[in-house]
Amino acid sequence: MPNADLIEQLATVAARRLGGNMRLLALYGSAAENPLPAHDLDFLLVVDAVENCVTQATQKCRDIYPNVQFFVLNTDEYRALPAFYRFQFAFARCLRGDLDLPPALRADAVDSILQGYTDTLRTLRQQFKRRKWAIADDWARQVWWDLKSFKYATLDLCWLLRGERPQDVGRAALILQGQGLTAAAEAVSEWPNLETAATQLKTEPLRWVLRWEKRVSAAFAEVRPLLSSK
């Protein structure tokens, strides 16, 4: 199983290619201490970089972690990222470099939560428009990846409500249950891993999409009124 050592190697190679005149900051968007399964590594960020310097270094990681989103940016481009991504990186673990990131802000949290829920629902509802279901592994992985926006919105919500951003969905479900958000807690507690979701999507795609559209819609109905008061 791929592990975090690969990302350490990536950071070393990229830093060497960038040279001493560039700062490198690579982060785990999941904020996991030691992500082992591929689906625990969600984002890799390189800041103050020239893109062609790190293309070769990141290619190997892309091959092993096909669902990772890569960001190769300069500082100004980082500041212009949507709140959803800035908020994830505010909690991520630094691998290399000492570039200061903006602190987590409540306004960013609200924007991130709204974007996470709306993006997820839009993606799920777009699947209903398909004339033919693309029953393929790549399609299933992409749908599952898009659903991760809901997962992150849920973690962001925990921070907004309790000042704690949990590293696992089990803890998130407990926090939401304690806040009386039953639908949101039930939805995130059933968060599927990649292998399970891909199998279900390839065997019963319509049933899977309908089920998650219903769950995320119910969760958003609970959550949305809270955001207007924050």
Predicted regions and their residues:
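A structural signal for short, well-ordered beta-strand segments
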Residues: 43-45
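Short, glycine- and small/hydrophobic-rich beta-strand elements in well-ordered beta-sheets
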Residues: 21-28
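Catalytic core of pol beta-like nucleotidyltransferases
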Residues: 1-16, 20, 32-38, 48-230
